[in-house]
Amino acid sequence: MAPADVPASLPLGLCLLLASGFGHAGKLLVVPMDGSHWFTMQMVVEKLLPKGHEVVVVVPEVSWQLGKPLNFTVKTYSVSHTQEDLNREFKFFIDSQWKTQQESGVLPLLTSPAQGFFELLFSHCRSLFKDKKLVEYLKQSSFDAVFLDPFDVCGLTVAKYFSLPSVVFSRGIFCHYLEEGSQCPSPPSYVPRPILKLTDTMTFKERVWNLLSYMGEHAFCPSFFKTATDIASEVLQTPVTMTDLFSPVSVWLLRTDFTLELPRPVMPNVIHIGGINCHQRKPVSKEFEAYVNASGEHGIVVFSLGSMVSEIPEKKAMEIAEALGRIPQTLLWRYTGTRPSNLAKNTILVKWLPQNDLLGHPKARAFITHSGSHGIYEGICNGVPMVMMPLFGDQMDNAKRMETRGAGVTLNVLEMTADDLENALKTVINNKSYKENIMRLSSLHKDRPIEPLDLAVFWVEYVMRHKGAPHLRPAAHDLTWYQYHSLDVIGFLLAIVLTVVFIVYKSCAYGCRKCFGGKGRVKKSHKSKTH
């Protein structure tokens, strides 16, 4: 028992402090994805550094965010394209989204202008393995694990090439590779396929469409990832599929949770860390505090379409500006395009804004978002109702989830008018049910035993300490498709049943012939004798 003048928590805290000092300091290889994907992945990496781990991040020389000064070792490799090529391909993809709204389902995405952008990303892996000096360095470094974003596939190839346990960090994976790689059951009867904008209560027609989409993914996704698998096969010197690359993953860290996601079965090595990006809110700067204070009793509306979309076609920008000018709130709009000529006095354009910090301010009334997972979770964490303008990818599903839960209104950004946006904003601001619903979601999301960032760090360290997590790997990985569905067992049992039925039938037929066939012949012979 602790002395009276010593706080009761001190001995426990001292023990934990001493125990942490004897923790395993490992060596982690990180293969990240550029853009907003890197923002939250970097949080995990930086949280690992004070624990004594050595972190090496491998990045291409050409990137948007990865080339910025970092607090850990960075190894770069040259690529065959320039920054202008990367910007051009991405701009081409983004511009196409402002011309035609992406149709529901993965298949339209596979045939969209995104193909050229992905081909550029996939080519990074060939460039990495052409750098023999870098490959030799990685080989000699004796890493404990690979921490990777699977979006460009290269991290999976790196893990397999060096035979290292891997931790995937992702929002999700379009196509069926998440289910096949993790072996999480995904019955199309109630688990909607990505980007279909469906819920788990589907009509018969929706279930038909969901199943067809599932079958279509198996037919067309391999061709979309052909460049990536060709490069992986070339590097590994053996033919591989996407499933071959995903199957060895030790732990899956998914940036979602069941506050947003629909309930579904998961495996023990699938860990949900939704809201990892909004764990810590800071006071807003003096500049933004001045904007907020000047808003008066009406408060502010935060408007951002994400870090990768900061310009909008002029006509659409003017429609948006007109709608924003009709509401009494102060609008803080992250926008770097041409200033709309009709911009109202209540709308302030900024090149960057502290989104999470502003949403956490008591005067935040609404959030206009493109429905990316980072923004959606910041809205949930801070309890701010949303007006959602999804453009592509998982944004469609995110918006549908929030709208279904009564926490926001979804608009078709290409077809909406100034009146539509005005009405949507007034609805989520003035209708109390939206605020109540988002606060309920916020309460559910925050009611957890451990912060998502700490949970992510724990599992990365876990894989490093134990050199993987094979005990969490389901045996389904080792079964063929017909064994997984017990078709061989069903066939065997069916064969037994049919054999028994056949034997019984033949026995009965034989018995009948013996019993009745013989009597018939006797009677017949008897009649012939009398004649």
Swiss-Prot record:
Molecular function as annotated in GO: enzyme binding; glucuronosyltransferase activity
Its EC number(s): 2.4.1.17
Leader sequence residues: 1-25
Glycan-modified residues: N71, N293, N431
Xref: PROSITE patterns: UDPGT (PS00375)
UniProt-listed Gene3D superfamilies: Glycogen Phosphorylase B
Record keyword Transferase present: yes
Protein family: Belongs to the UDP-glycosyltransferase family.
Protein role: UDP-glucuronosyltransferase (UGT) that catalyzes phase II biotransformation reactions in which lipophilic substrates are conjugated with glucuronic acid to increase the metabolite's water solubility, thereby facilitating excretion into either the urine or bile. Essential for the elimination and detoxification of drugs, xenobiotics and endogenous compounds. Catalyzes the glucuronidation of endogenous estrogen hormone epiestradiol. Involved in the glucuronidation of F2-isoprostane (5-epi-5-F2t-IsoP). Involved in the glucuronidation of the phytochemical ferulic acid at the carboxylic acid group.
Record-given protein name: UDP-glucuronosyltransferase 1A7
Highest classification ranks of the organism: Eukaryota, Metazoa, Chordata, Craniata, Vertebrata
